[in-house]
Amino acid sequence: MILINISLIFPIANSSGRSFFFTALLISVFTDIFALAFGKLLGKRFIYPSISPNKTLEGTLLGLLIPSFLFLFLGYLFIEVEIIGLEVFSEFLVISLFIDSYGYLITFFIILISSLASISGDLLASKSKRLMGIKDFGNLLPGHGGVLDRIDSHIICIPVFFIFYSLI
């Protein structure tokens, strides 16, 4: 719990903190988007039907891999390719910082682990709701549940990404 609080307070402190937070948030969002899209398109095997009945193996795997390759590619563009105007975006993402510190392969696994943490947060929230016998954590957002339903995947992803970020 303390780690979650630190990871949410730290980004406000300085611009690199905001970049960290923005990057972690994007990893989590892209993981959700790609897992959902490819799960609906290609999904045949359900992985946890009792916890999250619509999660498929295909969606989960592509939800993990595509953001990992996408962010690695963005990091490559920021470091290796000089495109006018692209340096503005590198200020918002800390991926190039990871690549400089760890190299491409380790950075790939950091993003992959962060994506896995995102999916774990979603599954943890789903399991909690099943245990409580509710569909959503609230009804603030019609059709989407409560605020916690919107950020469940970020709850674990951001602290995990923060651990790697703090080691740089």
Identify the meaning behind each predicted range:
Residues 154-164:
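Hydrophobic, well-ordered secondary-structure scaffolds
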Residues 77, 81, 162-168:
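Juxtamembrane boundary at the C-terminal end of a transmembrane helix
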